[in-house]
C-alpha cells in the first residue's frame, strides 16, 4: 500500500491543501523532465536520481558534503524526525520511500550513488565559513590571551608561539595536508583551564577533541576526522623517550590513508587538524639530542590570570572569536608563518 508521503511532506512546506497541491504540481513538472523508457515509465538511472535530488521540492539543496568531517549531511528541516545534521540510515529510508512513491524508482544502489554525486557537488566547509565571516574589531588579543586566561608571561616568545600555532591551524584548514608538525604545550597549573583554553580556541566544541588515547589504535584516524584542535593530555603525561618519539612521528604525518566502514576504496585524507599538549609538570619532555623543536612549551601561572576561562563562557568565546579574526587579517601574506617554518629552532 502506498503511503501518503505528500501529507508527510506538508510538515516542511505547510499542511495546507494549497501547499500540498503545489508540491504535487512541482513533482509532476519534474517527472516530465526525467528520462522515460519506451513504455512510458521513468527510467531507473543515476542521472534521473540526480535530477530528482536536485529538483524535488523537499530534497533540493539539502543534501551536502561537509568537507571538514568528510560526511554527507542534511541541512534544513525535513518531514521526518532528525537529531543532528549527519546523514543517517533513517534519512535514506525516507528518501527511498519518496523516490518510490513519487517517481517509481526503487534501486537503492542508484539512489545512493546519486546522493554521493549531489552531496559532492554541493559541498561546504564549516570551519572555512566560520573563519571567513569573522570581523576583527582591531583590538589586539593574541599577545595577551595566555596571560588573560592562564597567567602566562606577556612576552614576545609566548605571543609568537601562540601566533605560530594559530597560523598553522588556519593553514591546515585552507590547505589540508600542509606541513605543520608542531604542538603547542601548556604546562603547569592543575585545574587552571588549559584544556578549556584549547576547547574554546577550536571555535566550536565539536571541532575539539581530547579523545586521542593511543596513537597505534586502528581507529585513530577516524578520531581525527572532523576535529580542528586535538589535545594530547594523557600521552604527554608519560615523559619517556619512546613515547615522545612516537608523538613526534605522528605529528610529522601530513595525511592519513584509510578506508571508511562500508567504503570500497581507501582514500588519502590530508590532515586538517593541529595537535596541542597539556601537562601539569614543567619538565614533561625527556632530554633528546635530536632536539624537541616540535614541542612549543608555554608555562602558565593561574594565580596571575585576570579571569578564569569558565567564569563567563560567553565572554571567553567572544574573546577567542576575535583572536581568530585578528589572525585572519595576516593570513593572506602569511610571511611570519613561512619564515618560522623555514628556520625552526631546536
Predicted regions and their residues:
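N-terminal nucleic-acid engagement/recognition segments and initiation subdomains in replication
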Residues: 1-140, 156-160
Amino acid at each position: 500500500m502506498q503511503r501518503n508521503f505528500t501529507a508527510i511532506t506538508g510538515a516542511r512546506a505547510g499542511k495546507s491543501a494549497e501547499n500540498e497541491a503545489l508540491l504535487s504540481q512541482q513533482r509532476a513538472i519534474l517527472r516530465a523532465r526525467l528520462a522515460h523508457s519506451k513504455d512510458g515509465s521513468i527510467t531507473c538511472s543515476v542521472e534521473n536520481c540526480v535530477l530528482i535530488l536536485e529538483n524535488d521540492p523537499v530534497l533540493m539543496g539539502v543534501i551536502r558534503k561537509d568537507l571538514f568531517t568528510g560526511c554527507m549531511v542534511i541541512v534544513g528541516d525535513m518531514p521526518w524526525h532528525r537529531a543532528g545534521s549527519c546523514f543517517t540510515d533513517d534519512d535514506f529510508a525516507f528518501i527511498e520511500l519518496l523516490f518510490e512513491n513519487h517517481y517509481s524508482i526503487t534501486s537503492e544502489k542508484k539512489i545512493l550513488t546519486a546522493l554521493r554525486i549531489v552531496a559532492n557537488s554541493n559541498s561546504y566547509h564549516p570551519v572555512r565559513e566560520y573563519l571567513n565571516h569573522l570581523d576583527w574589531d582591531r583590538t589586539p588579543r593574541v599577545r595577551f590571551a595566555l596571560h588573560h586566561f592562564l597567567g602566562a608571561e606577556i612576552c614576545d616568545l609566548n605571543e609568537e608561539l601562540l601566533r605560530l600555532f594559530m597560523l598553522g591551524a588556519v593553514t591546515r584548514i585552507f590547505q589540508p595536508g600542509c606541513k605543520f608538525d608542531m604542538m603547542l604545550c601548556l604546562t603547569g597549573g592543575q585545574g587552571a583551564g588549559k584544556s578549556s583554553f584549547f576547547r574554546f580556541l577550536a571555535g566550536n566544541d565539536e571541532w575539539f577533541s581530547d579523545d586521542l588515547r593511543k596513537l597505534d589504535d586502528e581507529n585513530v584516524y577516524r578520531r581525527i576526522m572532523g576535529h580542528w584542535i586535538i589535545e594530547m593530555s594523557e600521552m604527554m603525561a608519560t615523559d619517556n623517550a619512546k613515547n615522545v618519539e612516537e608523538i613526534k612521528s605522528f605529528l610529522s604525518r601530513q595525511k592519513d590513508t584509510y578506508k571508511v566502514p562500508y567504503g570500497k576504496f581507501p582514500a588519502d585524507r590530508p590532515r586538517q587538524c593541529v595537535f596541542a599538549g597539556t601537562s601539569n609538570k614543567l619538565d614533561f619532555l625527556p632530554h633528546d639530542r635530536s632536539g624537541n623543536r616540535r614541542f612549543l612549551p608555554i608555562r602558565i601561572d593561574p594565580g596571575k590570570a585576570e579571569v578564569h576561562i569558565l567564569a563567563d563562557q560567553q565572554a571567553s568565546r567572544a574573546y577567542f572569536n576575535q583572536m581568530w579574526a585578528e589572525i585572519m587579517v595576516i593570513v593572506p601574506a602569511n610571511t611570519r608563518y613561512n619564515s618560522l617554518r623555514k628556520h625552526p629552532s631546536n
